[in-house]
Curated annotation (Swiss-Prot):
Flavoprotein recorded as keyword: no
One of the record's GO molecular function terms: calcium ion binding
Reaction catalyzed: a 1,2-diacyl-sn-glycero-3-phosphocholine + H2O = a 1-acyl-sn-glycero-3-phosphocholine + a fatty acid + H(+)
Cofactors (names): Ca(2+)
Tissue-wise expression: Expressed by the venom gland.
Primary role: PLA2 catalyzes the calcium-dependent hydrolysis of the 2-acyl groups in 3-sn-phosphoglycerides.
E.C. no: 3.1.1.4
Name of this chain's protein: Acidic phospholipase A2 PL1
Keywords, sorted A to Z: Disulfide bond, Hydrolase, Lipid degradation, Lipid metabolism, Metal-binding, Secreted, Signal, Toxin
Catalytic-site annotation from UniProt: 63, 105
Chief location of this protein within or outside the cell: secreted
Family: Belongs to the phospholipase A2 family. Group II subfamily. D49 sub-subfamily.
Signal peptide: 1-16
Length: 138
């Protein structure tokens, strides 16, 4: 448990889009994104395998697929430009790669908000060892 706390603290203070993504999740859902989604289901957090467990986990699966299509920058570390306008997330900036990363995060944050009713605490801190079904293709 101590190791998980250290990871969480490091992520909260992370520069780049991991902290930006957490901010988007917080603004769209009203909950603290990093802690609520970091090890949720089979796809939220680093890595992923098996079939998504619910619609919330599917948001993470789609987000992973989106990151996989980004070329030219590190999706987890680059800092992108975004703003909130009338409750909407608006991605900006001149770098097409970072804008693509922002769009991945924006779509995932909206997906989390639209699927909050599927969020199940039993999938928090879920072990990838329990994700045994064949993985889906993006």
């Amino acid at each position: 448990m101590r190791a998980l706390w250290i990871v969480a603290v490091c992520l909260i203070g992370a520069e780049g889009n991991l902290s930006q993504f957490g901010d988007m999740i917080n603004k769209k859902t009203g909950i603290f994104g990093i802690m609520s989604y970091i090890y949720y289901g089979c796809y939220c957090g680093w890595g992923g395998k098996g079939k998504p467990l619910d619609a919330t986990d599917r948001c993470c699966f789609v987000h992973d697929c989106c990151y996989g299509r980004v070329n030219g920058c590190d999706p987890k570390m680059g800092t992108y430009s975004y703003s909130f306008q009338n409750g909407d997330i608006v991605c900006g900036g001149d770098d097409p790669c970072l804008r693509a990363v922002c769009e991945c995060d924006r779509v995932a944050a909206i997906c989390f908000a639209e699927n909050m009713n599927t969020y199940d605490k039993k999938y928090m801190l879920y072990s990838l060892f329990d994700c045994k079904e064949e993985s889906e293709q993006c």
